[in-house]
Structure formats: C-alpha cells, structure tokens
Swiss-Prot record:
Belongs to the synembryn family. This is Synembryn-like chaperone C3E7.04c. It comes from the Eukaryota. Keywords: Chaperone, Guanine-nucleotide releasing factor, Membrane, Transmembrane, Transmembrane helix. The keyword Ribonucleoprotein does not apply. The keyword Zinc-finger does not apply. It is a single-pass membrane protein. The lineage of its organism: Eukaryota, Fungi, Dikarya, Ascomycota, Taphrinomycotina. Pfam families: Ric8 (PF10165). Its main location: membrane. GO terms for biological process: G protein-coupled receptor signaling pathway.
C-alpha cells in the first residue's frame, strides 16, 4: 500500500504528498511539505505496531533525521523527533538508516555540548528548550537500547558531555529559583541514558569514582525528598553500569543502608497480601516490583565482594527480634515482606535475587539458613539459589548470626532466645511446653479430624486406606500361619495367643478350619476358667 493511500485511510487529511517525506532546496533554504498537524496525527498513529510497520517502510529516515537537524529550533523538528522515536520503538530495524548519519552527530552535539554556538548557557536558559532535549535523550536511549556498538557517535565523548550536564543540572536543582519538577525530569533522562552509554565507553577510575559518588548522592536525596520519585529507580540502574569496587568500605556500607531504605519505601504489606491471594491487582503490583526491586538487590549482591561487609548486611537483612515476635510469614517489615515474596511464583525473579543474596550472606551454609529463617523459607532459598538440600534445621552452624535487638544493639544468636525451626519466630519455654503437651480432648479432636480426612480421601478414590491386620486376614496369611501353629504348638501357647494379640473368635475359627475338635473343647474350658 502506498503511503499516501494509507495516510488517507487514517484520515490525516494530506492533500498532496511527494514521493519523499522531505524536500530540500539547499541547507540555507529548507522547505518541508507536511503540515505539523499531520505529523502529530501520524506520531500518535505510530504508537501501534501495524501502523509503525507501514510508516517505517514508506519514509526515508535518513532524510527525516537531516530535516530534524536543520530545523532543530522549530516546532516541527520536535514533532518529527517524537514520530521517529515512536516508530523506532515499534520497528527497531529502521536504526540501520540512522546510526551512520552525520545529522545524528550534529544533534548530539547541539543537545549535550553546553558551549555549542547555537546553545546558550545551560544554567540560565535550559528551560527554554527543555522538552526538545528530553525528547532527544529518550530517542537516543531507544536507539542505543536496540542497536549494537556499530554507531557513528564517539560514546566516550558523549558520556563526558552527559556527565557534565548531570553535574550542572544537579547544581541547578539546588537553586530555589528553578522548577524542581522540570529539573527532576531532566535528571531522570540523564540517568536513564547513562546506563546504555556507560556500557559502550571507558572512563578513568578517578572520573568514574566522582560520578559514582554523584549518582549515590542523587539517589539518597531523591529518597529523602520524594520516595516515589523516578530518580530513585534510574539512579539504581545507573549505578549498575559503574564499578562499585571503586568505593571505600564506609561508602559501600552507606550504599547498603540507602538500598535497604529504598526497599522499605517500595514494599507495602497490603500489596504483598494481594500477591499472596492472587487478586486482580496482583499483575500490576508484580510488574511494579519486578521493575524496581531487582536493581536494588543486584547492587547489594555486588557489594558482597567488600571485605567485612557481610556482618553489616546481615544486620540489615536478617530478621530482628521484633520480627520474630510472630511468624515471619505474618511480618510487616521489609525483611519479612521480601521473604514472603519467595513463595509467590508470579515474582520469581525477585526471589532468585534475594535468595542468592541470603545464601551468600550465610556462606552457603544450609544449616544456618534453616536456623535463621525457618525450615519453610530455607527450602525456598535453597531452590531459588540452586543450592544443595538443607539438613535438619535443629543442628548448629559454626558461625554466629548477627542481629539487632529492639534497641538497635548488636546481638549474636547465642544471646538471643531460641528460634522456632519451622516458622522462624522466637519460642520461649512457655511456648515449648504448650506445644509439647496436648490435652486428651485435643488428642481426640485431632484423631477425629484425621479419621474424617482419610474417610473423605478414600471416598474420592484419592487413597486406599486398608487395615493391615484385616488385609492379612483377607489374604489368608494368618490362617496358614495359625494352621502351622496348631499343628506344632501346645495348649500353653494357644492360651498365650488368646490373652496376648489374637482374639478368641479367630482362634476358634482356625481350630474349626483345621478340624481339631478336642483342642476346641479344651480351649472353651480354658476360656471359662480364665
């Protein structure tokens, strides 16, 4: 289908359309023959895959990118950039026409180079073309996410320019005269773009350490000012593109504390309960958790290589004495909520990250895992982290478990109360005695429940419950045995069988079956005498 006919079928109202999407007279006098209203409608239509496929085959994207570069300061270039980004997201194959285009270099320089001739000071006039810069950064992020390393841009230079912009925007963010919401949006896009660019470029350790500390500062600030800010998520993703080994031990501990605070702000008890019950909202909640939690858990996993940091992470992530006042399955803290996510299949990737983290903190000792988290969660941790099956949770491990009490003081497991090996909660002597002793009424009630349970299972043909003694009698095994006994035994042995484990009716029947009438008469006399 020709592009003209397809666009007319969409009702976009183009009266005339040339063979190419663009027309050039020369660089000084450009003309573009598509109305901006039509571009906006086409941009919205390209949000659908089928529309994007038709448009992708019809437009010359190399020429379109050149138009965007030449008309950069006009509104039409902004809408064309949005059209290009929408279509590239749906049809990544059009990137082949873009990655080696010189116009891509010019656009990148115009956006990121602060001292470019056409761009004034970033601090004073950034808000004038704020939307234009944000749209281009989103387009570049989509392009780098779908394209390999084969691209005309100098990624090292782009990364340096992006870091300079990040520093200045962070300085601008501290100024009360600026719109914090707009600044936050730009910071979000810069952090989003840092992840794919950092994977394609090299940075000196000194410079990388500085930008690493800056990203950590942005992360901590966003958590304190607005816990729901998207800066939090993009900062954690950006950190994964840097070498965290450049941090000192104190800085690594600080990052782990920020990570735990972030986990606490994300996890909500009510949402975890929705996931456990499988309610209608569970898919949205699962998508939210799978987008936000794995990067934070991946950062904590990468911090494990620091010497002597396991003790600090254990005190942050292991259940506290307050958590153990009830079963860990009912806990409301972020530690208990993460454990509860281990049992929910819809968020299995989160369970894999967290189980691997806990397994590393316990040095792969399955005995210690079972003793800290209980037998149920220990099995889940072993399955998610692909470790060997754990032994009895009652056995002792060599290394102590570091925890914090309600006052925030460090405790080792030897100073704590005993932990229930099943639920992971504390068990006092009173609880132990209550659990071991059952009244006669409770025993009868439990026996009755089991009786009805097996009865229902037998009626449903789930299991076949057969009395083993009755089964032996029906098979004729007892008859054969007692025939041999009566042929060889004495009266004293018959008397002993009668009073021990065999009823008188069975003995009489066996005697009749063997035709030993004199033994029957004598047996009746013995029975009467007894």
């Amino acid at each position: 289908m020709e592009l003209e006919a397809y666009i007319q079928s969409l009702g976009l109202g183009i009266e005339s359309y040339s063979q190419s999407a663009t027309q050039f007279h020369d660089e000084a006098n450009q003309s573009f023959n598509i109305p901006i209203s039509t571009i906006i409608k086409l941009k919205e239509a390209c949000r659908e895959l089928e529309t994007s496929k038709v448009v992708a085959k019809s437009l010359n994207w190399s020429h379109l990118l050149r138009v965007i570069s030449l008309l950069w300061e006009k509104d039409v270039s902004l809408e064309l950039m949005k059209l290009l980004a929408n279509c590239l997201r749906q049809v990544p194959s059009i990137s082949v026409q873009i990655v080696h285009n010189e116009s891509l270099k010019q656009l990148t320089t115009s956006v990121f180079e602060v001292r470019a001739p056409k761009v004034l000071s970033l601090i004073s006039t950034f808000n004038d073309d704020l939307e234009r810069r944000v749209v281009f950064m989103r387009f570049l992020f989509i392009l780098l996410s779908t394209q390999t390393d084969d691209i005309c841009l100098d990624m090292r230079q782009v990364r340096t320019q992006l870091i300079q912009m990040l520093k200045k925007m962070w300085t601008l963010n501290s100024s009360p005269s600026n719109n914090s919401q707009d600044n936050e949006m730009v910071l979000t896009e810069i952090l989003r773009l840092l992840f794919p660019i950092s994977k394609r470029s090299y940075l000196k350790e000194e410079d990388e350490q500085k930008i690493l500390l800056l990203v950590i500062e942005i992360w901590a600030s966003s958590l304190n000012n607005n816990p729901n800010s998207p800066l939090r998520w993009h900062a954690t993703n950006a950190l994964l593109s840097f070498n965290l080994q450049l941090l000192s031990l104190d800085q690594a501990i600080y990052v782990s504390e920020i990570a735990c605070q972030t986990l606490q702000s994300i996890l909500i008890s009510r949402e975890v309960e929705y996931l456990e019950k499988g309610l209608n909202l569970c898919f949205d909640i699962a998508a939210k958790y799978q987008n936000t939690l794995p990067p934070i858990l991946a950062i904590l996993l990468s911090l494990l290589s620091f010497f002597n940091i396991k003790q600090n992470l254990s005190m942050l992530l292991f259940p506290t004495n307050d958590d153990r006042k009830q079963s860990l399955q009912k806990g409301k803290s972020f530690r208990c909520l993460l454990l509860r996510l281990l049992t929910i299949p819809i968020v299995e990737p989160i369970g894999t990250y967290y189980a691997s983290l806990l397994n590393e903190l316990c040095d792969g000792d399955s005995q210690q895992i079972a003793r800290i988290f209980g037998a149920g969660y220990a099995m889940g941790i072993s399955q998610h982290s692909e470790t060997m099956p754990f032994p009895s949770p009652l056995s002792k491990a060599a290394s102590p478990v570091f925890q914090k009490n309600s006052r925030g003081q460090e405790n080792t497991e030897e100073n704590n109360l005993a932990i229930d090996p099943i639920t992971g909660s504390m068990c006092t002597n009173r609880n132990k005695s209550q659990r071991l002793e059952l009244s006669q009424e409770e025993k009868e009630r439990e026996a009755e429940r089991l009786f009805y349970l097996f009865q229902r299972l037998e009626k449903n043909s789930t299991i076949q419950v057969t009395n083993p003694i009755q089964q032996a009698v029906n098979s004729g095994f007892i008859d054969v045995v007692f025939c041999l006994i009566f042929q060889m035994s004495s009266e004293s042995f018959i008397y002993h069988c009668y009073h021990s484990f065999v009823g008188p009716i069975h003995i009489l029947l066996l005697m009749f079956s063997t035709f030993k009438f004199h033994e029957i008469l004598h047996f009746i006399k013995i029975s009467k005498a007894s």
